[in-house]
Amino acid sequence: MRRGMLSIGLALLFVIGAYAPLFHQPQSASNIIVDSKIGDFSASQIPTSTVFSPSQEYWSEQEIAEPMVLTRDLRALHAWQIAHGLLPEQAPGNLQDVSISTGIVEHRRVTMPGFLVPKLAGVEGVFAVFEDRTGPEPVGALPGEPNSVKSGQIHGAVDAWDRGYNGSGVRVAVADSGIDFAHPDLNGTQAVLDDPNSPYDGWGIMHDPISLVRWQRDGLAYPAAGNSWWVDTTSVDVDTNNDSILDNQGWDINGAPLSVSGVYHFGEHSDSRLIQRAGGNVHILVIDTQVAGVYDTILIDIDRDGDFGDESSVNQSNPTYGRDTNGDGLWDQSAGLLWWISDGINGVPYGDIYAARNGYQNRVAGAGDLILLMLNDASEAGGNHGTLCASAVAAQGVISNGAVLGMAPGAELIAVSNLYAGGSWLDSFRFISEGYDGNASTSHDQGQIGSFSFGNSAAHDDGADYWSLYLDWLTRVHSPETTYFVAVGNGGHGYGTTASPGGAHGVISVGAFSSKGSTWGESASWSNRGPNSVSRLDPDIVAVGWSATGDRTLNEVTNANNARTTWSGTSLSTPIAAGLAAVMYQAWNNATGAWPDSQT
C-alpha cells in the first residue's frame, strides 16, 4: 500500500511538473531566479513533499550515497550542491560553462554523505529521491533454429514495400550495445543530422554514454580510458623533408591526402575484436585536407602494413570503413563508423546538455585531438545484441543472398550504444527524445521511434517504478513525438512478469508470438506478460519472436556472408515491431502530411 501511494504521488508530481515552461539561465550560484508561477500552477499550489525510496532513514544510515534526484529546478539543486561542496570532480582542461535549466523536470545523480540526503527535501523543485541501483540488461537473444521464419511476409511488410512504404524518412533509435554500421547489411542506414545551424550538421546522430562520461568527467578517451570507443588523437607527427614518410612513426603516406598544416594527428583504434582480427593495434591518422587546422578526414591502417596511402578516406561523406579480405567485394572486417572529429571550438555532440544535467562543465578537445567512433564490440557488455536488433529494423539484405532483411529498410538508425556498460538509463532515454540540441520541441535530431530490447526484471513494481514513470512522462508529456517500443522480457511463464520499463503506461510493450508448428500465432510460453502493478495487462502487441535471421558483427567472423545468425526472444520482437511502426509512420505522413505522436 505504501509503495502504491508513493507511486501515485510521484506520478502526480511528474504531471504537475510537465506544465512548467522551459527556460535557461546562465550558470551561477548567486543569481538564481525562480518564477513565482509555473505554468498554470502557482508556486503555493505545487506539493512541497518529496518522495524518498528507500526511506529517509535508509539514506541517513549510508556513509556515502548516490541517489538519483528528480527535480523541476535543476539550477536550485546545482546551487545547493555548490554550497555543500557536492559537485562532481572533473579533470582539468578546456572547460566551458553551461546553462542549467529551471522549470522543467530533470534528473541528476548526486554523490553525497548519507546524512545529507534527507536535506534534499528542502531544495526548491526536488520531488523524488531514488536509489539507482540496477542497470539494464538485454532481455536475451534466445538461440534460433536452422530454418528461420520470413518475418516480412508474416507481418505484411513485403506488401507495404511493394506499395512504396519502407520506413523512409523515419528515425528509429536502437538503444543497446551498439551498431556495426560497417556491416554490409547496415552500411548507410545511419541517421544524419540535417541542421545548417549546428556544428554537427552532416554527422551521424549517435549517443555513447560511457565514452561521454569518461570524456566529460575524466578528460580521457581510448587507450587511456579502456572502456571508451572515442579515440585520443592528440599525438602528432610531421613530414619535414617531404619524402612521404612521417618523421617519427615512419609510416608511409605516399598517396594519402596531404595535411594542409603539415601536422598529422594519430591514435589507436578502440575495437578489441578488430585488434584481435588484425593481429595488433590498428593506427589512425587524422588529416586537415582542406583548411589548415580543420581536421576533416581519417585514414585507418586496417591491414597494419604501415602504409596509409592504400587506405580510403573516412570522413563526413564516407563515415564507415572496413576491409575485404577475400576479394568478394564485401567488407569482412569492420572499423566502425566515424561520427565526429573535434574542431577545437565546440564540445562533443550532446556534451553541453549532458554536462549541464550531470553537474559538469563542457569539455572541448583541441582541433583533431579526438575522434568519435560508433562500434559494436562483441567482446563487451551486451555482445552483438545491438547489431542484431538494428538488423531487425533496417537490414538491407546484402549478405548471404538477402538472408537478413529488416522490416523498414528505408529507416534511419540512431545508435544509442554501450547501454549495458554502465551509466544512467535516464540519460539515454532523454537523448532519444531530445537529440543533440536537448530540445524535445524540435523535430530534426531526435528519434521518432525508440526500440528497447532490454529491461530490469528486479523491479517488482514494474509500471510504478521510477524508470517506468520517467519514460511514461517523457513519451506522453515531455516529448510526445517519440514513441517507445519496449520488450516485456523472456522471463515467463506466468502472469505479472513484465520487466521494467515495459510496464510504463505511455509506451508500446512488445511480446513474442510463436511462428512454428501447432503453436503458430500464440504468445510464446517464455514471453513475459501482465498484469503489472498499475493494472496494465501487457503486452500491447506481439510480433515474431522465434527463429528469425539477424546480423552479427563483422569482427566475430572471417567472412561477411557468415556475419548472420538465427535468434529469438522479445529482443527480436521489439525491433521488428519498431520497424513495422516506421513503415506505418511513413504511410501516415504520406496520407496526412504530419507525423503521428506517441498516443495516436
List each model region and its residues:
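Autoinhibitory propeptides
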Residues: 78, 82-163, 187, 192, ...
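Secretory targeting signatures
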Residues: 1-29
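N-terminal domain-start motif of subtilase-like serine proteases
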Residues: 29, 33-63, 82, 100, ...
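Active-site neighborhood of phospho(di)ester-bond hydrolases with catalytic His/Asp-centered motifs
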Residues: 451-453, 484-489, 510
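Hydrophobic, small-residue-rich alpha-helical packing segments that form membrane-like cores
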Residues: 425-440, 452, 459, 464-467, ...
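Active-site glycine-centered loops adjacent to acidic/histidine catalytic or metal-binding residues
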Residues: 176, 471, 489, 569
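Subtilisin-like serine protease catalytic core
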Residues: 159-295, 302-303, 307-318, 322-425, ...
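Extracellular S/T/G-rich loop segment that most often corresponds to the catalytic His/Ser-adjacent loop
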Residues: 344-346, 354-364, 499-586
